[in-house]
């Protein structure tokens, strides 16, 4: 009678343990009870439960670490993107001001120097910026406008210099014709009239 009760108690205990394992550790092999003899492949019931619980805790800790690491990376990317977007928007606003000053002809020397540097590096920067399409298009339009206006201004300056040089050259020619040897009209400068020796010419100049 006591043996039957003991066997029943063992089955009940085994069922309880298997129920706990099923809830806590899904997929873990169940403990089998056989004719009053409990066989466990890796040791006693307590050892098996302890080992599996530790394994479960390790897996949970590893998952928590991965989740924290992933969240940290996501947060870092968001902060970086927010900072980049802010810098790009500030630069866009600055370019718009420069564009306005360019059209109005009120660029300062500092702004003009900045534009010269901007034109050289703007193409590479535009490729690397991660902006919305419309912002990228706006920046490209500003770049092209600035480049066009700057080149036009440079061409105008060169044209003015060429016209001034031509005018100056013509004036120099006229002045040169006017200051010919006025003592002997019609003669090429540097030539003395027939009969006038070099000594006479030299004495007169003295």
From Swiss-Prot:
Source species of the chain: Saccharomyces cerevisiae (strain ATCC 204508 / S288c) (Baker's yeast)
Pfam families: RRT14
Main location per the UniProt record: nucleus
Location of the protein in the cell: Nucleus, Nucleolus
Family membership: Belongs to the RRT14 family.
Bias (Acidic residues) ranges: 197-206
Record PTM Phosphoserine, positions in chain: 197, 202-203
Region (Disordered): 178-206
Top-rank taxon: Eukaryota
Biological role: Involved in ribosome biogenesis, probably through modulation of rDNA transcription.
Keyword 4Fe-4S on entry: no
Other observations noted: Present with 3670 molecules/cell in log phase SD medium.
Protein's UniProt name: Regulator of rDNA transcription protein 14
The entry's keywords: Nucleus, Phosphoprotein, Transcription, Transcription regulation
A cellular-component GO term for this protein: nucleolus
